[in-house]
């Protein structure tokens, strides 16, 4: 960042203005004045909330102008190292959309220090670039620090079944809110790379926590950013209070945090002779784990439901879905992911990949090329995020219209209820997107089963056949001993990868599942009631 040289003519959001009188006039427009006033008011307000104490924290707002596209609008940013409760409009910096400082605050007499633009500036500009935001807030609120300390090795904050989740864009009461956590650094500007990675890995998030530091929150406008920041801080505070009470904020019931020993699903109180579902407890698996990680296809759900129902539905409706929702933010996110994947496929000679024509040829031809690529991906049964995310959104339409109903094996609800009653945490890890996973269990043939799950993982954690993916899940859940988690899958290669990470593993034998290698060395089950 820098200041244009004296006497030069600069291009500010598409308008050629000089750096002297023209710049001065431009800085005095109504939009810039209002944005400066608003930013100073919000600084004073957020100081009272404890977000901007000790000169910490910062805010930035785009200068709204209907005649200028948001990516090219001017940016107002609060300064660094000043008393936020005493902020006035003249204290604000004004930057161009590409980060050049156009206006600096005036010098103030002792004991004030010379003005300095906040160290958050490169992070703010990165959020503007990646999320087309209208405002970004960086809070040092105490709750945003402490919540990252509760699970010191976790890379995510998760919470569900709280009313204030509805205040976060794209989330409802039953949804699981996931906020990525990045590690703090000595200098704020050094966070840009990890912030970029977090925003890329979590396309739905509107916040990123910085461990032992604070949180960045953004929205389409200053109102959206402020409202969501208030909701995030409420949820962080709720998690801390629940933790103090020994209650689990990450589960639907927010029940006691338990350490389970002995037989799963019976609190260790059942006698050895008791029969369960026709199985003797002598035949049941008795691990000491406190978490279960479940696959879906071939484990909780028949393979035929996926291959004969879900995949054909997505295949038959991809063109219709893209045409009907093409301009929506959700579908544009899907299309951007597909573009990246298709470009990668073309560069690597993947069969079925075809180039996407430029937008000016018309929407119909562009959609047709996407359909051709997606159909090729479906035929090849590729487990890639771009495809899984789009399929999930197509299936959402099917579930909402009651054209689709999720299917689980008959033993699944009973087992989930038993584990839940015993305080055992259950998670899902599937190649399908998190959203698709929740659709299956919220619209199942046994009703809404989501209350039994503590979280959902997809391939954003990594490939299911790679060991590092399971290490990531362990770190996210906050489990110190890998053997405290039991993984249930029908895929031998996944079982091998999970075992290499230290998890206990059993293989699910269900109708329609593929054969296993001879002498595979894993315990097998035919029903969850064996666990």
UniProtKB/Swiss-Prot annotation:
The keyword Zinc applies. This is Probable bifunctional methylthioribulose-1-phosphate dehydratase/enolase-phosphatase E1 2. Binds 1 zinc ion per subunit. GO terms for cellular component: cytoplasm. Pathway: Amino-acid biosynthesis; L-methionine biosynthesis via salvage pathway; L-methionine from S-methyl-5-thio-alpha-D-ribose 1-phosphate: step 2/6; Amino-acid biosynthesis; L-methionine biosynthesis via salvage pathway; L-methionine from S-methyl-5-thio-alpha-D-ribose 1-phosphate: step 3/6; Amino-acid biosynthesis; L-methionine biosynthesis via salvage pathway; L-methionine from S-methyl-5-thio-alpha-D-ribose 1-phosphate: step 4/6. Its cofactor is Zn(2+); Mg(2+). In the N-terminal section; belongs to the aldolase class II family. MtnB subfamily. In the C-terminal section; belongs to the HAD-like hydrolase superfamily. MasA/MtnC family. It comes from Vitis vinifera (Grape).
């Amino acid at each position: 960042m820098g200041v244009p040289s004296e006497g030069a003519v600069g291009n500010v959001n598409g308008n050629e203005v000089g750096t002297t009188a023209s710049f001065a006039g431009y800085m005095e427009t109504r939009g810039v004045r209002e944005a400066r006033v608003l930013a100073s008011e919000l600084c004073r307000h957020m100081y009272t909330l404890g977000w901007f104490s000790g000169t910490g924290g910062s805010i930035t707002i785009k200068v709204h102008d209907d005649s200028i596209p948001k990516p090219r609008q001017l940016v107002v940013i609060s300064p660094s190292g000043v008393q936020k409760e005493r902020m006035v409009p003249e204290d604000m910096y004004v930057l161009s959309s590409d980060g050049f400082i156009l206006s600096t605050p005036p010098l103030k007499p002792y004991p004030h220090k010379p003005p300095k633009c906040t160290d958050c500036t490169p992070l703010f500009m990165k959020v503007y670039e990646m999320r087309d935001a209208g405002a970004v807030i960086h809070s040092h609120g105490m709750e945003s620090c402490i919540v990252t300390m509760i699970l010191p090795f976790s890379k995510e904050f998760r919470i569900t079944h709280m009313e204030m989740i509805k205040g976060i864009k794209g989330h409802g009461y039953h949804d699981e809110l996931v906020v990525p956590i990045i590690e703090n650094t000595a200098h704020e500007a050094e966070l840009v790379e990890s912030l970029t990675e977090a925003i890329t890995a979590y396309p739905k998030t509107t916040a990123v926590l910085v461990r032992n530091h604070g949180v960045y929150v953004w929205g389409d406008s200053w109102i959206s950013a402020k409202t969501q920041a208030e909701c995030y801080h409420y949820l962080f505070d709720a998690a801390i209070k629940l933790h103090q009470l020994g209650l689990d904020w990450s589960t639907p019931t927010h029940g006691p945090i338990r350490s389970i020993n002995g037989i799963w699903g019976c609190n260790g109180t059942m006698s050895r002779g008791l029969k369960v579902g026709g199985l003797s407890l002598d035949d049941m698996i008795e691990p000491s784990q406190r978490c279960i990680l479940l696959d879906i296809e071939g484990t909780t759900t028949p393979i035929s439901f996926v291959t004969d129902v879900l995949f054909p539905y997505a295949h038959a409706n991809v063109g219709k879905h893209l045409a009907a929702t093409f301009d929506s933010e959700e579908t544009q996110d899907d299309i951007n992911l597909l573009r990246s994947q298709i470009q990668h496929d073309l560069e690597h000679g993947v069969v079925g990949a075809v180039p996407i024509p430029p937008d000016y040829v018309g929407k119909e031809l562009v959609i047709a090329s996407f359909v051709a690529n997606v159909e090729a991906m479906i035929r090849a049964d590729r487990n890639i995020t771009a495809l899984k995310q789009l399929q999930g959104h197509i299936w959402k339409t099917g579930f909402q219209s009651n054209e689709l109903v999720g299917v689980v094996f008959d033993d699944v609800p009973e087992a989930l209820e038993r584990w839940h009653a015993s305080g055992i945490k259950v998670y899902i890890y599937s190649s399908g997107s998190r959203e698709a996973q929740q659709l299956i269990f919220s619209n199942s043939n046994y009703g809404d089963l989501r209350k039994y799950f503590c979280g959902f993982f997809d391939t954003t954690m990594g490939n299911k056949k790679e060991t590092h993916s399971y290490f990531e899940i362990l770190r996210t859940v906050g489990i110190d001993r890998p053997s405290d988690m039991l993984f249930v899958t029908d895929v031998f290669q996944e079982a091998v990868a999970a075992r290499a990470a230290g998890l206990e593993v059993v293989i699910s034998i269900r109708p329609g599942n593929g054969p296993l290698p001879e002498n595979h060395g894993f315990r097998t089950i035919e029903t969850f009631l064996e666990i």
